[in-house]
């Protein structure tokens, strides 16, 4: 074997050895290597995995409030969105997502979600020249006045007692009221549920938008109807029977 053939043989063996290191059977392709969940930074992926189940794949149409509603996004600032995602909303189905609160997301990932919601769905000028009721009320509303506010602004759709009408369902159902927070009720009164045909505070009575006091009062009325113990009540024990705590 002359020198040239020796060089070619060595080069060939080296190439085969390199291929064996990089192209061995079973070695995953670069794109197939799983990404550390903490490193996911794409808004679409994070929203789909953590938000779409309740808020809808396009930010609307889910059981929870529409995040694609530009009126809502003009009312709720980034601190409100971040706080809800970080700590959840007590006594509701909205869980805490931040790792510091027992969730699965880093603070950076929550920032990505908040920023993505704002960039994708907000319309900064949607409330230009309009003065809606504030997101949070500095004062508690009056339930007695709220009953009258309901009759004026809400009964045409939800019925005279709030138990449902031809256009909308019950908003006084005990199970429903037990699943939502006071703030959720207030927010829905202000921004409506446009994806469900429910108008915001301006559209219930043409030419007569709800005042901030109207919003606070009807919210207080709804809150007053929430049962202390939601669900079907159990019958009380007979007077001559005392509970023993034993299961039989």
Can you say where each PLM-predicted feature lies in the sequence?
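Disulfide-stabilized extracellular ectodomain repeats and their linkers
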Residues: 48-51, 64, 91, 151, ...
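Bacterial N-terminal signal peptides that target proteins for export
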Residues: 1-10
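Gly/Gly-Pro-rich "capping" loops immediately C-terminal to redox-active cysteine motifs
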Residues: 33-40, 44, 56, 60-86, ...
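Repetitive helical segments and hydrophobic/amphipathic motifs
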Residues: 13-14
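Hydrophobic/aromatic residues in well-formed alpha-helices
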Residues: 6, 80-81, 110, 185, ...
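C-terminal motif of bacterial Sec signal peptides marking the signal peptidase cleavage site
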Residues: 17-20
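Flexible coil segments in periplasmic/lumen-exposed cytochrome c-class electron-transfer proteins
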Residues: 25-33, 37, 41, 45-48, ...
């Amino acid at each position: 074997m002359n020198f040239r053939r020796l060089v070619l043989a060595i080069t060939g063996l080296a190439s085969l050895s390199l291929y064996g290191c990089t192209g061995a059977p079973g070695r995953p392709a670069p794109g197939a290597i799983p990404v550390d969940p903490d490193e996911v930074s794409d808004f679409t992926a994070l929203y789909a995995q953590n938000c779409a189940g309740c808020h809808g794949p396009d930010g609307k149409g889910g059981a929870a409030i529409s995040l694609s509603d530009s009126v809502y996004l003009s009312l709720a600032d980034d601190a409100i969105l971040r706080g809800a995602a970080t700590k959840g909303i007590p006594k509701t189905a909205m869980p805490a997502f931040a790792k510091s609160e027992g969730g699965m997301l880093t603070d950076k990932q929550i920032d990505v979600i908040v920023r993505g919601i704002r960039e994708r769905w907000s319309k900064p000028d949607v409330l230009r020249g309009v003065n809606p009721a504030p997101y949070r009320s500095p004062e508690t509303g009056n339930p007695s006045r709220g009953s009258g506010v309901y009759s004026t602004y809400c009964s045409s759709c939800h019925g005279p007692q709030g138990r449902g009408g031809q256009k909308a369902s019950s908003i006084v159902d005990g199970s429903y009221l037990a699943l939502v927070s006071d703030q959720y009720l207030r927010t829905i009164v202000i921004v409506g549920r446009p994806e469900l045909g429910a108008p915001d505070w301006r559209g219930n009575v043409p030419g007569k938008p709800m005042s901030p006091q109207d919003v606070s009062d009807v919210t207080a009325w709804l809150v007053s109807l929430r049962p202390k113990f939601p669900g079907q009540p159990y019958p009380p024990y007979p007077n001559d029977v005392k509970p023993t705590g034993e299961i039989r």
